[in-house]
Curated annotation (Swiss-Prot):
Protein's name according to its UniProt entry: ATP synthase F(0) complex subunit 8
Entry keyword annotation includes Transmembrane helix: yes
Quaternary structure and interacting proteins, as annotated: Component of the ATP synthase complex composed at least of ATP5F1A/subunit alpha, ATP5F1B/subunit beta, ATP5MC1/subunit c (homooctomer), MT-ATP6/subunit a, MT-ATP8/subunit 8, ATP5ME/subunit e, ATP5MF/subunit f, ATP5MG/subunit g, ATP5MK/subunit k, ATP5MJ/subunit j, ATP5F1C/subunit gamma, ATP5F1D/subunit delta, ATP5F1E/subunit epsilon, ATP5PF/subunit F6, ATP5PB/subunit b, ATP5PD/subunit d, ATP5PO/subunit OSCP.
Lineage per the UniProt record: Eukaryota, Metazoa, Chordata, Craniata, Vertebrata
Gene: Mtatp8
Sequence positions bearing N6-succinyllysine: K54
GO molecular function ontology, one term from the record: proton transmembrane transporter activity
Keywords assigned: Acetylation, ATP synthesis, CF(0), Hydrogen ion transport, Ion transport, Membrane, Mitochondrion, Transmembrane, Transmembrane helix, Transport
Length: 67
């Protein structure tokens, strides 16, 4: 049975990889990509919730007077 000649495999694989890389670069460079989105200034309206309209004081245990 004859032995398989692998002496040309290296140059074949390298040249096909280079060819695929060049074709991919040409394909990507021909595409048109959209521009980066411009930032939009958003003005948020502060909505008062019912618990913010009422004044409440929370007494912590440390702030209570000594008994």
């Amino acid at each position: 049975m004859p032995q398989l000649d692998t002496s040309t495999w290296f140059i074949t694989i390298i040249s096909s990889m280079i060819t695929l890389f060049i074709l991919f670069q040409l394909k990507v460079s021909s595409q048109t990509f959209p521009l980066a989105p411009s930032p939009k200034s958003l003005t948020t309206m502060k909505v008062k919730t019912p618990w913010e309209l009422k004044w409440t004081k929370i007494y912590l245990p440390h702030s209570l007077p000594q008994q």
